[in-house]
Amino acid sequence: QHTVALHQVQWPERTRQAQRTAHFSDGGSVQCTDAAAWDAWARQSGLREPLVVCLQQSWRGVLASAVLLVAALLALQQWGLPLAARTVAHALPTHVDEALGQATLRAVDEQLMKPEPSAIPPAEQERIRTAFRQALGKLPAGEVPPWELVFRASRIGPNALALPGGTIVMTDEMVQLVDSNTDVLTAVLAHEMGHLQHRHGMRMLVQVMLLGTVSSVLLGDFSTVLAGGAALVGQSHYSRQAEREADAAAVRILRAGGISPAAMVTLFDRLAEKRRASKAPGQPDEKNGKDGKDGNDEKAHWLGLTFASHPADAERVRFFQEAAKGR
């Protein structure tokens, strides 16, 4: 006869129908095919199963766990991860942003820009920089991070991109779209400065990495499919939030510089005119590419003003119209 204390026995996780097993420290084990009798003996002996095992034996427990898991993911996405990413991003030294920005600029030049240099004359480029610098000069000291404005001939049409580390890329087509209107171009740059002020590039990277990691941990074996989808959904949500923050920053900069926020409304009007002009005659918006945008816009969805996850144009237009009225 072999006697072993219950606390020295290893009890594998049970299932509803399979045989019951116990493992001993000396390598031996016992099996019982009468699951009901084994379970009755276990209850009488005071053996308690972990809560997870109990939940797995009940469809109600599984359903409740799934609901709690989804709620936890949503709460993390809405509040936890943005706060964590903001904290992590601001704790990182700025040279990390600069290194990331340089790598991103190389990718942008290779994938989105034309090989030839900008066609905007140097004097015109400097005029745009000077106007923007004057608007920023009215802000309180310390609110403006280091920045550099560069111009590129692009394959993506009118656009402007704020890269980590302080580089702002403006395409020639953006300047041409608004006929070199200084107020409108300053408004565009003010929006991009909002991204730099909030370090959105670094925050987006940290948030997506955190969301993917947390999703993989929580979703377990389903992480390959579901965690990737959760990360994409989260990234889109975070991008919309970033755009709203950048729009609010643009309004502050424009007001400080004595420029009406209605300048951004002019930009959206010009973009809408360009989209209408690029459509085939009689073709409705929703049939022309994605959301009625032209092929150039399709290439730029991952960066800049035509980002696919930007808030709807109508929402943003209303925001700047209200801001222009002083609200």
Q: How would you label these PLM feature ranges?
A:
Residues 1, 25-26, 164-165:
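Short acidic-glycine loop/turn motifs at beta-strand connectors
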Residues 3-14:
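Phosphoinositide-dependent membrane-docking surfaces
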Residues 10, 23, 161-162:
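Well-ordered beta-strand positions
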Residues 44-287, 296-326:
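A Zn2+-metalloprotease active-site environment signal
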